Amino acid sequence: MLEIGWRLRDKDVWAAVSGLTVGEAWLRRDEPKAPEIVAKYERAMEQLARGVPFAYAVGRAGFRTLDLTIDARALIPRPETEGLVDLVLQRAHGGLAADIGTGSGCIALSLAVEGSFDRVIAVERSPEAAALAWENVALVRPRTPVEIREGDLLAPLAGARYRAIVANPPYLTEDEYAALSLSVRDFEPREALVSGPDGLDATRAVLAGAAALLEPQGLLALEIDERRGAAVRALALASGWTRMEIHDDIFGRPRYALAQKTALEDE
């Protein structure tokens, strides 16, 4: 019979692999344990001992109201990104929304579950990450339709106009990536983190092409590196955007760039 020490990490792991809250796991600690859950627990503990991030080890990650499947096919959702969703939900309603570089699908699914959009299109260039996003669509089963399209950045969005385009693109340089902790570099997908010599290749491309895809007064919302607010604002102005706001994340760092399409951008 499996003996769990019920230290904080033990409880967290058991709760995650068994689909319970930590409180529920504690209350049911003396109940017989299903062999398949025991196997998941032991596998997760072995992975944690090797330095695998907690979310990957247990195969689950929370994001806003969602409990999602997660593995090394996509980045682990970050709490900072939840704030990006907040800003979009406050400013955009109805119509089509798009999520660029969806990864696990956390942004797209949050927009579908919490927002009032008619439909959400999620774009992902990695076939493996796109498959994970589809798994999470099946898991969450949002009432608002979510469609995953494979392709790079804005290309799969052609042929429609969007009320909101949201993106958490890669935004690090190679040097910044090299300075990350081993728990990130050894396990999370590099291509979801690094974006050219200045870290802005993906952001630059989205700023250059998004206006043509937005409805009048449509919203572009980007997560950005905290060190690049001024650079992103300059890129936006160079791309013809006339309204750009930079907002702080929950840690007080400039993290979100919001641009609204005006008549000038529609010319």
Place the predicted regions along the sequence by residue.
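Non-catalytic nucleic-acid substrate-recognition regions in nucleic-acid-modifying enzymes
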Residues: M1-R9
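Flexible, glycine-/basic-rich loop-and-beta segments that form/coincide
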Residues: T262-E267
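Conserved AdoMet
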Residues: D12-L87, R91
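Mobile active-site "lid"/loop adjacent to the S-adenosyl-L-methionine
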Residues: Y171-A202
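General small-molecule cofactor/ligand-binding pocket signal
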Residues: T69, E147-R149, E245-H247
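Conserved Class I SAM-dependent methyltransferase catalytic core
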Residues: P197-Q260
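Helix N-cap/coil-helix junction residues
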Residues: W6, L20, P142-R143, W241
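Conserved SAM/SAH cofactor-binding pocket of Class I
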Residues: E80-A179, A205, R227
